[in-house]
Amino acid sequence: VTRAISAITRCRHWTTYYKLLERGSVRTLRLAHALFEVVNNALPMETLNLVIDDTLIPRQSETAPGSAIRHDHAKKTNRPQFLQAQCWVTLGVSVLGNGGRKYVLPIVSRLVPLAGNRNKLIIALALVRGLAPVMMNKPVRILFDAWFMKARLVLPLLSRKMRVIGQARRDTALFMPPVVLLKPRRGRPKIYGVKMTPESILALPVTELKLTLYGKEQLIRLRTVVAMARFLKGRPVRAVWCAFYDADRQCWSKVRLLLATEIELSAENILRLYARRWGIEPLFHNLKRWWGVNNLWQQKRIVLELWMQIRSTAWTLVQLLSLVAEESFPITVVAPWRNKQPLTGGLVAQWLRMEFTGLAFRDGFNRKSSIFTFPEQCGDPRFRG
């Protein structure tokens, strides 16, 4: 916050800006709606691919909003299994950049509270419901990992005509469709057929192919079938069992199960679509490491979520500029040694600091004529006339 205040032309005391953030009436959902519309207009998409995931931000203070002893399911080397941290649930939009690179642009985040009945599943559903008014009736596909693949979240999404692709537990109860009887019998018709056992899964046809996923070409072994998921109350899903070949260890990885409610999709397409979820992991890393999320100090949940929304908005706009403004970007002024190289969000952020630091926006607005004239740049000397 201090760095943000120091970057503007201040006309009030420092405390005024802190109080503006703490007592302001800015609603995070309105900011999220406006941000979503900007992304949708800049990068039109026939189908909206949304990603939902959670992350932990370590905290020393036990009195910080939402700070508690939480389980770290990342299982990183030399890291404790439980730590004092805040848990955030984020909803982002998956977009494709140059060379097919996958990005996730954060739209809105919510802090998991310390007390109450609101858990991550309820918050994730609330985030989708909050963005529904600005989705403009477009087809929506939501991607998430195994933790969010629960009936409590998936069934309400399906009732909203949304599509879901997610990883599930390998022991998820799956059944073949029931056999259609030529002659009707008495009683209720069967919902499930034969249960899928490990033996029946191994008996499925195997397909081996090479796909470029997660940044490299990988050899993948696939098995797929259309089955009925019991935790979804018998809804048909396309089940894909996939294993990756580890060239270093010369062995296959453990089998992972992906479920897609779009049964018309092929196993290859499901794998490609689910790989777009991984873009949220570098997003969390960059927000924590380079965009100050690790240093959020606000002592009230509402203020903390507001500043998190401001940081997410800044990150999304920077990444959006790197995707749509590459041809007109002044790379020879910002970083001439990076000429003819792909434009990154870091270069855009550097240009924004050079262009807008110390810019007196209030001086550019004429109250008498109600006309805004872009003020003279008085920050970085490279942009002075």
How would you name each of these model-derived features?
Residues 46, 63, 98-385:
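Single, function-defining residue in the core of a domain
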Residues 1-29, 35:
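Gly/serine-rich nucleotide phosphate-binding loop at the start of the catalytic core
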